Curated annotation (Swiss-Prot):
GO terms for molecular function: heptaprenylglyceryl phosphate synthase activity; magnesium ion binding. This is Heptaprenylglyceryl phosphate synthase. Gene3D superfamilies: FMN-linked oxidoreductases (3.20.20.390). GO terms for biological process: glycerophospholipid biosynthetic process. It comes from Brevibacillus brevis (strain 47 / JCM 6285 / NBRC 100599). Keywords: Lipid biosynthesis, Lipid metabolism, Magnesium, Metal-binding, Phospholipid biosynthesis, Phospholipid metabolism, Transferase. HAMAP family: GGGP_HepGP_synthase.
Length: 231
């Protein structure tokens, strides 16, 4: 199994977005700890396979965060399986996982599977709309959701997902407290090294995504910012 507990920084690439070879090389050779592949809309088998085949040129670990059963591609180093803890649509908590096991259970290498408890904190995000995510009312509730993930569901990762907007450090700190021994990922809205460093002081792993496609230099600068931050 991939040792995600050593990750401080990861980039997240969306198969439905375009990235040229030069930019991809810069991302993969940046010193980031891993590349996560995943997205909410437009993720297909073909575009996931195409991105995976390009990533295989590099030594950096590549993991697939599964959001669609139609886009499960073999060949990644590991697979992240999200459970959306605050999904308002209960079908997004366990129903996709049951369907996935019915379809692929005989082929799964369980040592390649890592489960995540997602807390979606941006109600305007596409993933929030898709799952009808319940808003996070305050820090106390964020902590409680994280406690559900680690103490009730026994999930190894808690993922605070702000998806496109920069998060409230108070909320993220509360989730970190609630996560206990679980590993806290933070993702959402990081546009510069300063924001990356602020979240790196709280979370175990900082995930940088959209800025890759808007400002590559700023994205690359987040690696040093995160890895130079104590937490």
């Amino acid at each position: 199994m991939i040792d995600y507990r050593g990750w401080r920084h990861t980039f997240k690439l969306d198969p439905d977005k375009t990235i040229d070879d030069e930019a991809l090389e810069a991302i993969c050779e940046s010193g980031t700890d891993a590349i996560i592949v995943g997205g909410t809309y437009g993720v297909t088998y073909d575009n996931t396979l195409e991105l995976m085949s390009r990533l295989r040129r590099y030594a950096v670990p590549a993991v697939l965060e599964i959001s669609s059963l139609d886009a499960v591609v073999p060949g990644f180093d590991s697979y992240l399986i999200p459970l959306v803890l605050n999904a308002g649509d209960p079908d997004w908590i366990f129903a996709p996982h049951v369907s996935g096991l019915q379809a692929f259970g005989a082929y799964i290498h369980w040592d390649e599977i890592i489960t995540e408890g997602y807390i979606i904190a941006n109600p305007e995000a596409g993933v929030a709309q898709l799952t009808k995510a319940r808003p996070i009312a305050d820090a106390t509730q964020a902590k409680a959701y994280a406690q559900v993930a680690t103490n009730i569901c026994r999930l190894p990762i808690v993922y605070m997902e702000y998806s496109g907007t920069y998060g409230d450090p108070t909320i993220v700190k509360a989730a970190k407290t609630g996560a206990g021994e679980a590993h806290l990922f933070y993702g959402g809205g990081i546009r510069n090294p300063e924001q990356a460093a602020e979240m790196a002081a709280i979370a175990d792993t900082v995930v940088v995504g959209n800025v890759i496609y808007d400002d590559l230099d700023a994205a690359l600068a987040t690696v040093k910012a995160v890895k130079g931050t104590q937490y």
